[in-house]
A protein has these predicted regions:
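Short active-site neighborhood of thiol/selenol oxidoreductases, capturing the structured segment around
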Residues: 23-42, 65
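Residue-level detector of Asp-centered blade-edge/turn motifs that repeat once per structural unit
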Residues: 178-182, 234-238, 292-294, 346-348, ...
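Short, internal strand/loop/helix patches
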Residues: 83-111, 116-118
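Gly/Pro-rich loop segments of beta-rich domains
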Residues: 154-174, 202-228, 260-286, 316-340, ...
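Thiol-/selenol-based redox modules, centered on thioredoxin-like
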Residues: 120-175
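N-terminal "domain-start" segment that seeds a small globular fold
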Residues: 1-24
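Structural microenvironment flanking redox-active thiols in thiol-disulfide oxidoreductases
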Residues: 46-88, 99-103
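Conserved beta-strand positions in repeat-built beta-propeller and related beta-rich domains
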Residues: 186-191, 241-246, 299-303, 353-356, ...
């Protein structure tokens, strides 16, 4: 059998989460696990969770996990943005920034995520793409540790893990929702594993739902637990707040009158392909956003590249649109393709979808049961361009909100809020980041958006409310005065 020697890391590449750059020479005697990832990718997010469990298992053994960040999007090539992703996903292992995908090419990688395992002698012994392979990784590590007993390093590598900024009231807020009377805003405070209800008039927190600890626990709003929730919708009929509890792979319901949280779909385990069924028995896959229509709850099932439908009436859930193949393909509901749908908005019988990995806005005609693309072209065609929707470019949009003849878009990786004129078929930038301006938390007048994940229009005050995720803020844009301000949130 041919022995394949591992290629060392280029000497001048940037390293994060470690005191010093690493090399395979330095790591001789260790089992090295390389994770080729890019932080936009839902499968990579899942792999981070799988590797976290293994990291803790082998914490005191000569095993080193290294993230090789090989960026897909322009925005993901920025070191500061990669640092934000490390904080957001609580990555504890070293990460090397793979400039121009040099390490990717050296290892002949062709998909995210890909795992490569290197034995203590520096030979590649395992290479596989895709998620759901933690058991295989574990088996290989155990075999190598056993095979090289007495020949491996005696101490684990010590490195500098990322530390969270505890000075912010919010921590990577994901999505927002307004109540029926536009008096309150609900916020998924994702990395604090909770939901906040805030009064718009004075910014005062009225309810904190969730105790801040990770978990899938129902009960009182003080005892309940979430795990990085994202999507949120406030029912105009009964006041129930629905939550896409993303990393629990579940849908939760918050009853503010009775101060209770209930799981209505999912069982905490990640599922793959399913025809659906009784919602509590069905395994979901990273639900990222929700939209409500009477007794129907639409779910952006990012991990399956589909839109699902939950029936509030009979507690069933099943795929609604999308074949499950990742792509951008317009067709009928069953054969159309989505790519990590992450935002939903229902308007005039059309369900608009922020289809993040295809950098597009899609439209589902509910009665006609067809999918079409409003703006966007392909999985690898993205950028920043206003004008005709046929020529315009987005970059990994996560949020969408339609009102009258406009579709507001949180164009996440362009750090912008865009508006699509449905009739004129034109797109323009409402809020954008100027060239060379850096985010400064001490100066709200010049603070630009930083990977905003959601936007909601409030017709009562003609303002846009924005989940400014990486700035850990809720921003407010007055359309008349064209002033962007920061919402003051107080206890």
């Amino acid at each position: 059998m041919e022995v394949i020697k591992a290629k060392d890391f280029p000497p001048n590449f940037v390293w994060l989460n470690t005191y010093e750059p690493l090399s395979l020479t330095r790591l001789k005697g260790y089992v090295v696990v390389l994770d080729f990832w890019t932080y936009c990718c839902i499968n990579c997010m899942h792999m981070i969770g799988e590797l976290s469990r293994l990291e803790h298992k082998y914490r005191d053994r000569p095993v080193v996990f290294i993230g090789v960040h090989s960026a897909k999007f322009f925005n993901e090539q920025d070191v500061k943005n990669i640092e934000q992703a490390i904080h957001r996903y609580e990555i504890e292992h070293p990460v090397v920034v793979d400039e121009d995908m040099a390490i990717w090419r050296a290892y002949n990688v062709n998909a995210w995520p890909t795992i490569v395992i290197i034995d203590p002698l520096g030979n590649v012994v395992y290479k596989r793409s895709g998620e759901g392979q933690s058991e295989f990784i574990e088996d290989v590590i155990d075999v190598l540790l056993d095979r090289y007993t007495g020949k491996v390093a005696t101490e684990p590598i010590r490195y500098k893990p990322s530390s969270r900024d505890t000075n912010n009231r919010l921590y990577y807020p994901g999505k927002i929702a307004l109540d029926a009377e536009y008096r309150y805003i609900a916020i998924t405070d994702s990395n604090n594993n909770r939901v906040l209800i805030v009064r718009l008039s004075d910014g005062r927190i009225i309810h904190k739902i969730g105790n801040g600890m990770r978990g899938l626990i129902d009960g009182s709003i003080d005892e309940a637990r979430f795990f990085r929730p994202q999507g949120i919708r406030w029912s105009k009929d009964d006041g129930i707040i629905y939550i896409a509890d993303t990393e629990n792979h579940a849908i939760r319901a918050i009853d503010l009158d009775n101060k209770k949280v209930t799981t209505i779909a999912g069982n905490g385990r990640q599922g793959y392909y399913s025809k659906g069924g009784y919602a509590k028995d069905v395994q979901l896959n990273s639900p990222w956003d929700l939209e409500i229509d009477g007794n129907k709850l639409y779910v952006a099932m990012a991990g399956l590249h589909q839109i699902w439908l939950y029936s509030i009436e009979d507690s069933s859930i099943s795929p609604f649109a999308g074949s499950g193949y990742e792509g951008i393909y317009d067709s009928d509901l069953s054969t159309a393709e989505f790519a990590q749908p992450s935002g939903l908005s229902l308007h005039r019988g059309v369900l608009y979808v922020a289809d993040s990995e295809s950098s597009s806005i899609r439209a589902i005609d509910i009665s006609g049961r067809r999918v079409k693309t409003i703006v966007g072209r392909d999985l690898f065609v993205f950028g920043y361009k206003d004008g005709s929707v046929y020529d315009a470019l987005l970059q990994h949009p996560l949020g969408v909100d339609a009102y009258k003849d406009s579709i507001y878009v949180a164009d996440t990786y362009n750090h912008a809020i865009r508006a699509i004129d449905i009739n004129a078929r034109q797109i323009r930038t409402i809020i954008g980041r100027k060239e060379g301006i850096e985010c400064r938390l001490d100066d709200s007048c010049t603070l630009m958006l930083y990977e905003p994940s959601d936007v909601k229009y409030n017709p009562n005050d003609d303002r846009l409310y924005i989940a400014d995720t990486n700035n850990h803020m809720i921003r407010v844009y007055d359309k008349e005065s064209k002033v962007l301000s920061t919402m003051k949130i107080v206890l």
